[in-house]
Regions:
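Conserved beta-sheet core of the metallophosphoesterase superfamily
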Residues: 97, 101-105, 122, 126-138, ...
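Structural motif
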Residues: 4, 40-41, 118, 216
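Short, well-ordered, mixed-charge alpha-helical segments that flank or form enzyme active sites
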Residues: 88-92, 118-119, 125-128
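Active-site-proximal loop/helix segment associated with metal-binding centers of metalloenzymes
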Residues: 121-200
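Histidine-centered divalent metal-coordination motifs
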Residues: 9, 85-86, 120, 218-221
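A structural signal for the main folded, soluble domain(s) of proteins
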Residues: 1, 9-12, 31, 260-266
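Core catalytic region of metal-dependent phosphoesterases/phosphodiesterases
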Residues: 5, 10-111
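Beta-strand-turn-beta hairpins that frame and shape the catalytic cleft
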Residues: 1-3, 109-117, 228-233
């Protein structure tokens, strides 16, 4: 089996009982390890991740999660971690700690006779995306894209890494909490297949002849399995803090969505 999950947002100040949240995620990974060949984590596994030039003691809170990933790797399970828009600031440290292969951009893989396009999903738009939305929505998307450019600016990344971790984390985790609370207050449900950016992106890829059997995304915190052509589907992974959604690909090439129940959080 190959498993896919995303958006755990570990360390979030907006998620109560953080240790119980991390424990349930570890239990979920242990369940997957029973028959997993590979596990793909498609971004935002951390609510905020920055690798400073000075040692960051706050990352100790993730030690149980790191230990589980190393244990999975020792069992021969291939671990892949994609960066998201909350945890893109890794410069080799995350790989060193976990042994996972880190992906900074979308990738296409071939498994069990199927072609899969994997991405966190932030910033993926069809080329003519402005034709689909009114001015208010276009402005919102443009703001996000500008922010994404700032986050990826190497000079600004260097300067932020120079900050004492205590100050940087206060800024980073505070920003992430504000973003999460805003999402709770103003949820953005599925927009429909004619307006959902990632669905439009996948449809355009198919029209251009870039066929994939499955497009698998995180980012949107919605659970979705949508047929966009007779032989192509878009799958969105929900999250791993509320919905506890994951997908698995069996050796016949069948992809299915599931919700992990696990033990009740205490």
């Amino acid at each position: 089996m190959i498993y896919f999950l995303s958006d755990a947002h570990l360390g979030s100040l907006a998620i109560e009982r953080g240790w119980a949240h991390q424990k349930k995620l570890i239990q979920m990974l242990e369940m997957m390890s029973e028959d997993a060949v590979s596990i793909y984590m498609l971004g935002d596994m951390f609510d905020f991740w920055m690798e400073y030039f000075i040692r960051d003691k706050k990352k100790r809170q993730y030690n149980p999660f790191f230990k589980e990933l190393r244990k999975l790797a020792k069992k021969g399970i291939h671990i892949h971690i994609f960066t998201g828009n909350h945890d893109l600031w890794t410069f080799g440290g995350l790989h060193k700690i976990t042994g996972a292969e880190i992906h900074f951009s979308p990738c296409t893989i071939q498994r069990y006779g199927k072609t899969l396009y994997l991405a966190h999903g932030d910033g993926l738009l069809p080329s003519n995306w402005e034709d689909y939305y009114p001015s208010r929505v276009r402005k919102k998307i443009n703001r996000f894209m500008r922010l994404k450019k700032i986050f990826n600016n190497s000079t600004l990344q260097f300067l932020f890494r120079c900050l004492p971790p205590k100050i940087g984390n206060k800024i980073g985790y505070g920003w992430a909490k504000k973003s999460r609370l805003k999402e709770i207050a103003n949820p953005c449900p599925f927009k429909g297949e004619h307006k959902e950016e990632l669905v439009l992106f996948a449809k355009e890829q198919e029209k251009q002849g870039n066929h994939r059997d499955y497009y698998i995304f995180g980012h949107r915190h919605i659970e979705l399995d949508l047929q966009i052509t007779p032989d192509s589907r878009v799958v969105m992974l929900g999250d791993c803090f509320q919905q506890w959604t994951y997908a698995k690909l069996d050796h016949h090439g069948r992809l299915t969505l599931h919700n992990y129940e696990g033990e009740d959080e205490q």
